[in-house]
Amino acid sequence: MMVKVTKLVASRPIVVFCVLAFLVVVFECIWISNWRTTTENLVKEVASFTEDLRTSLVSEIENIGKFTYAKTNLSTIGLARVIDSYITNNDTGFTEIQTQIAPLLFVAYSTILQVSQVSYISRDGLMFSYIAESNTSVAVFANSSSNSSRGDYTWYTQTVDQLTGRLNGNSTKSQSLDVTHTDWFQAAQSNNYTTAFVGTSLGGEDNETLIQSVVSLYSKKGLVSLGFPVKTLTEVLNSLNLHGEELYMWTKDGTVLVREGSLNDSFFISNGSICFGRESNSLWSQCIPENCSSSGYEVEIKRLRYQAFCSVIEVSGVPLRYTLMFPNKGGATRIKHQAEKAKYQLIVVMIFLGFGWPVWFVWFMMQATRREMHMRATLINQMEATQQAERKSMNKSQAFANASHDIRGALAGMKGLIDICRDGVKPGSDVDTTLNQVNVCAKDLVALLNSVLDMSKIESGKMQLVEEDFNLSKLLEDVIDFYHPVAMKKGVDVVLDPHDGSVFKFSNVRGDSGRLKQILNNLVSNAVKFTVDGHIAVRAWAQRPGSNSSVVLASYPKGVSKFVKSMFCKNKEESSTYETEISNSIRNNANTMEFVFEVDDTGKGIPMEMRKSVFENYVQVRETAQGHQGTGLGLGIVQSLVRLMGGEIRITDKAMGEKGTCFQFNVLLTTLESPPVSDMKVRQEIEAGGDYVSTPNLGLTINTSLGGSMNIRNLSPRFNNCLSSSPKQEGSRVVLLLKNEERRRVTEKYIKNLGIKVTVVEKWEHLSYALERLFGFSPQSSMGRAECSLSCPSSRELPFIGMDGIDSRSQLPKRRSISFSAVVLLVIDAKTGPFFELCDIVKQFRRGLPHGISCKVVWLNESSTRVSERGDISCSRPLHGSRLMEVLKMLPEFGGTVLKEPPTELQRESLLRHSFVAERSPKHKVQEEGPSSMFNKKLGKRIMASTDSESETRVKSVRTGRKPIGNPEDEQETSKPSDDEFLRGKRVLVVDDNFISRKVATGKLKKMGVSEVEQCDSGKEALRLVTEGLTQREEQGSVDKLPFDYIFMDCQMPEMDGYEATREIRKVEKSYGVRTPIIAVSGHDPGSEEARETIQAGMDAFLDKSLNQLANVIREIESKRH
């Protein structure tokens, strides 16, 4: 288009000039005409004056409604809560009302400003009320129930003492009303809880109109009502200076409160609308609709025109409607001369621009013509080259997709054939070992193919996130548990560092768990690969996305939407402003949290000059990659996935002298539970870097001296004040003897943050001395590092943040005299020293324990067969996350109980079965957390595949008896039954053009008990078999039996592919009224576009060529069918 314009300017500049000049003149004429019209409208003074007056009056009326009786509802709610706390019996009689509730009512009657009535009404009609009359106060009460069948429900009126509220003189009967059947009473007793209305007082002689604020008691035993005179509101409104305007106000039910104007004699309410004009000998009337608030409503009354504006104000919860009437009296113009002068100035400027701008434009376009024509030829050549490159790229992508599909199919067939061969050889033989090695190589090929495919998807922009609900803390623990055995073979410990504990509070999130696990797996795998000694720490915490955060917003518009947005941004500053607005909107979302992860190792490290290039594809650090094979795609894919999830990854600097590398990345995830307003303070505490302790997902329960229990998630400062009133004893202590220094430091810090005193022993030789001195000195004594953790201020003054976001350190009860016995929990790593000598030290310590203090021992990395003391627990898996919290639940502060004698064998088996649940006796029962607790009672072995495309998790429960918890050889699978004989008696059709794939699928189905497997190599053959089977079924009359119970359909086949075959089969089945489950089998990923097309084609499920999830898919289909 631009080329055509420049060509036209170059060939005929005079014509272009004339056209442009004409257009400018026309534009000027239109502009001047609009200017004149606008100026004439502006000189009309009445509209502006009326609008200003209306705005000011409306503002004054709304302020009056806002600040008159502003706190009546709060007063009513406060009085209701106080009365509710005094009512203890279910059936409260009039005597209790007169002696307990009446004094509270009189206190409210005496202290609340402008109150005219304070009443309490029980749900059976018993009532007591204080009412203000002319110069005195009276009490109106009903001492009998309105539900009585005797019909003697009566109200009495009696004067009261102005100072004490006591009844004086004799009572007199007054007009009674069954308030329990009124609309406002029923509304307050229902789910509404509060209500308000305008009505007369409950009793008394004046019958003054009041604004009644009614609040139901939380126990639903009655309600409380406060009445405030309407006269105060009307006096304030009548005192307004309306500047000759008229004001009318009424309630929803038609009660007129204010009528201030000359139309009082003809004013009335009809069906909620205000009407005028009704006279004694006239039937006409003029009504104003309720929706006249937007632009005003023109009405003519008594030959005068008015403009009416309607609105609603809320006074103490009661909506009041009002109408402002403005008479139209005309106006005058005062700025006409200024407008005419500005008009002439504008004409002069436009004439100058009308001739100057076209000349400049023609000259500029002629200069640009030469450059444009030269660029045209270059652009044509570039477009042809680009189109050719795009065709090549499309062909390459298609060829790569087909090749990857074939490679996946071949690898799946290879793995299937390996499984078939392994079934026929002796386990542990040389052939079995060789086959196992071949299987490992096949898995490596699949992992390599997945990496290449992921990079291809990322480069083409086809990578998409699959959001789902998952538990973040469990995902972290599963990743670490998977790599811990591999790292321990090298002498490297993998530690989970919860940092401030915030990741447990916000553990239930929504996002792509598969991609997040892929990121963590890659980083931890690299850390294990390049670390030969020391440790690997995986650290995580949550924080609000702040202005200094490096988060790259994943919701920022991409593609066409981004281009459209950029069309309206004139420069980079506007584009940056738009980007900032989106960033602020996401950061202000209360459900969006930024999760920061760190993978810190003590390996060889990455040089400073290689830190940026290490995230590029096919780049490896030579200094650290020697002896390790790889493609160099891992970190490049990780960076792309992190950015896709709305974050950024970087390598952080470590302290001087520390070796290794620390990768840090952050992602945006959505929390599933909307945090309350008070949680904002908690998040501010997280952002400030303070230790966070209130983690509701931990399921920690603290036993109180009152015999009940208190959950940390419900802790509030008010409850802490209640606790602090009773004296407490010295609490439990934890003694840590761990081999790895980093695990020791992380565990110590986390237990301290929970408020438990910790003694750390670095060497096993110091254990005896530390245990002897444990109770030999006061907490103020000095005994080196072991006692410092019990006495230093940083331990005693740990911040304890409740769910209301308030620091409760000053309100926490001091641990000096607790009602339960203290416990010393010993956590000992058996690899720190000789096991039997450690056992002797523990036995000697137990013999010397003071009365009332018990000892519990958790042995790490040790088989329970060597644990001699009954009641001791052994664990062969790393102590962190849920297992650490289950250990802490053995303490009485967190729900554990103290046994007076060693547990029986049956009790010990229960201990091992429930995995670290505290000992139980018939007299003491531990309160357990509900389903929301993050700690699965079935701790066990979790195995995750290292590939990015597939993962499996097997949960095994621990056998009862004297077995260590978490030991793989002592676990049995209980989460689901065996897959053997799962499809006994079923008839299956396998459709695949590859013979090996059919053979592998047939073998697996036979192992699952399938009685008959029929094979075919094309979709057309499958359609024929299904059609013939349905026809024979109809002829034989066996309508209850399908030709095939399941059909496994390959997606890509010659002649007729799986998609078309499925559509045709569904058409045939529709005529018979049946549906056979069709499971798609393809070499593509489950989350790919091809997988979504299978569902659209009518297939019931999707499987990759490996068929690893075959049993799960069939179970899911069967569950939907039944």
From Swiss-Prot:
Residues 987-1120 form the Response regulatory domain. Expressed in vascular tissues of inflorescence stems and floral organs, especially in procambium cells, and in siliques. It holds the Pfam family Response_reg. It is found in: Cell membrane. Residues 1-12, 367-1122 are cytoplasmic. It catalyses: ATP + protein L-histidine = ADP + protein N-phospho-L-histidine. SMART domains: HATPase_c, HisKA, REC. Residues 918-981 are annotated as: Disordered. It comes from the Eukaryota. Residues 34-345 are extracellular. This is Histidine kinase CKI1. The gene is CKI1.
